[in-house]
Amino acid sequence: LGVSLPGLTQWEKLRMSYVKPDQLIDAIVHSGVDKSNLTVPQMVARGTLAGAILGAATTVALTAAEQTGLPIVGAVLFPVGFVMIILLGLELVTGSFALIPLAVMEGRTNVAKCVTNFSVVIASHIVGAALYGALYVTAITYAGTETSDPMVQAIVHLAEHKVLPYEAVGLGGIVAVVIKAMLCNWMVAIGTIISYSSSSTAGKILAMWLPVTTFFSLGLEHAVVNMFVIPAGMMLGADISFGQWWGWNQAPVLVGNLLGALLFTALPLYFSHRTRINRAVDVPPSVVRREPALLDF
């Protein structure tokens, strides 16, 4: 660590930044412990900023899709927000859904701290996303005096699409939204965990980009994205009430995101790579050993 290797090419350096899966588990468990031990003010600050950043990334994606007529362009651009959140060390509850429970499983934190983190960060996301939404709505409507911007109707349509079709079919709608949320956070949790698979910034960015682009391109349900889209749509006149928002989208999406992170990502990876021998010790991710020749390029 810290040794200069001037003779290596950039490709060789990228190979050396790869972290083995068993060491990856050490890193994410340690991260889960760190997240559970944050103070409430830290959680509030990090969660609020993350909510606002993800709202901004969503508007970038919607703007790109609107301008090009190609939703896939928006999906490719959306991960900029996720990358900023991870690299800045902020709190994104959909990622924490995969990390903190593993720390609880290993007895390195407790359920009370886990629930506190989830609750405080979710509330902070709502504040950050809604604040950004209010500022963005004010900007594109010229303080409520103009509604000709194409983004107005794009956001209203998306907000209504995230609530009304589920409500229209009743119980089947709840099942559908939970499944969409589970599939979404399968990818988001992979994005969170895979960011620990490289010790280089470039490697982290590339690794995160792939699964996050996948979820957004499929039109799945992400709780924090919806904390921006639906309130912003309501501010712009979407035919949605607070009860409809929470009953037919936000609450079931949070449940689905938690289940997806745990059942589809965290637990399968944990039980695939964790053994008694490599069970986590209190080693921070920054000192996880690197292996130079682990990939066949």
What is the predicted role of each segment?
Residues 1-15:
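Short, Lys/Arg-enriched N-terminal segments with co-localized hydrophobic residues
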Residues 14-297:
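Alpha-helical transmembrane segments and their helix-helix packing motifs
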